């Protein structure tokens, strides 16, 4: 079985971005700038933010973290977003989710300028994705597509099944897989809680993407031998970190599969860095 190593792939991308940034520094006059907003003390969110800061440092991107208390008001948060929208040295704004109770995350996401929405969650960027127009793509599904391309695994002309329909992963991933292109162009089925026979749908997949948010939901009897399996889930259990798929069993029959951890997670951050550099190039007018 081919291990789809997101950790190694992401490291290679960071190295490439570092060279890209270094080459454009003189023309741009400054490094790319990413603002990260963290509200509250959620431990998982703090880990994610530290990982993003570390990734920025390795890629030559200047990151600026804004850590706000859990009792921050909606107005205060929106004022900060407005300030960052107006700063010339900030190319991307990332709002770490989830937000504490009482804060409207959708309102905040819509407040971020679409031109600085490097997470790809603004309705304008989601709409542009649906219409096949240029724009920032949500980082997790875009990272998945980048991983497939790096391993030269093309779903073109194949049956792709996406388990999960969230706005963050499932919906945009289905759109990306069904779009024209060498590393897309698949026939896509989206499964969810209303799917009558999930196992049967999964067994039809040449490419199976699982983003259901349920640990070990997909088992080996639900996977076609020789399929490519991408596990987007990650869960902390008594046995350690697991995904939405039973890795040990499925890896025996799949042609290729992502591990958990070390698969999709690092690619999500890599795609965030890619989006930030793209924004920097566009905003500073440098070529490439």
Swiss-Prot record:
The keyword NADP applies. GO terms for molecular function: methenyltetrahydrofolate cyclohydrolase activity; methylenetetrahydrofolate dehydrogenase (NADP+) activity. Its EC number is 1.5.1.5, 3.5.4.9. GO terms for cellular component: cytosol. One of its GO terms (biological process) is L-histidine biosynthetic process. Keywords: Amino-acid biosynthesis, Histidine biosynthesis, Hydrolase, Methionine biosynthesis, Multifunctional enzyme, NADP, One-carbon metabolism, Oxidoreductase, Purine biosynthesis. Pathway: One-carbon metabolism; tetrahydrofolate interconversion. NADP(+) binds at residues 164-166, 193, 234. Belongs to the tetrahydrofolate dehydrogenase/cyclohydrolase family. Homodimer. Catalyzes the oxidation of 5,10-methylenetetrahydrofolate to 5,10-methenyltetrahydrofolate and then the hydrolysis of 5,10-methenyltetrahydrofolate to 10-formyltetrahydrofolate. This is Bifunctional protein FolD. It comes from Nitratidesulfovibrio vulgaris (strain DSM 19637 / Miyazaki F). The lineage of its organism: Bacteria, Pseudomonadati, Thermodesulfobacteriota, Desulfovibrionia, Desulfovibrionales. The gene is folD.
């Amino acid at each position: 079985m081919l291990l789809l190593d997101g950790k190694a792939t992401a490291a290679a991308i960071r190295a490439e971005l570092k060279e890209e940034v270094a080459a454009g520094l003189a023309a741009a006059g400054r490094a790319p700038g990413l603002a990260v907003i963290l509200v509250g003390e959620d431990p998982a969110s703090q880990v994610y933010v530290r990982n993003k800061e570390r990734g920025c440092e390795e890629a030559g991107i200047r990151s600026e973290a804004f850590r706000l208390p859990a009792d921050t008001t909606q107005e205060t948060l929106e004022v900060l977003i407005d300030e960052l929208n107006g700063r010339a040295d900030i190319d991307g704004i990332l709002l770490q989710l989830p937000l504490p109770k009482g804060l409207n995350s959708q309102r905040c996401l819509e407040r971020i300028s679409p031109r600085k929405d490097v997470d790809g969650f603004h309705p304008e960027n989601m709409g542009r994705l649906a219409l096949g127009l240029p724009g920032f793509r949500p980082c997790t599904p875009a990272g998945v597509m980048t991983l497939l391309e790096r391993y030269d695994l093309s779903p073109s002309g194949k049956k792709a099944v996406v388990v999960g329909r969230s706005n963050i992963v499932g919906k945009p991933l289905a759109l990306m897989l069904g779009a024209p292109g060498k590393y897309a162009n698949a026939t896509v089925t989206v499964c969810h809680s209303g799917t009558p026979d999930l196992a049967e749908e999964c067994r039809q997949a040449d490419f199976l993407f699982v983003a259901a948010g349920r640990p070990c939901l997909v088992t080996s009897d639900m996977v076609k031998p020789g399929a490519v399996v991408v596990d987007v889930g990650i869960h902390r259990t008594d046995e350690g970190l697991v995904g939405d798929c039973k890795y040990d069993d499925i890896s025996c029959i799949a042609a290729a599969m992502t591990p958990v951890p070390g698969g999709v997670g690092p690619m999500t951050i890599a795609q965030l860095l890619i989006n930030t550099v793209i924004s920097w190039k566009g905003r500073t007018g440098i070529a490439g």
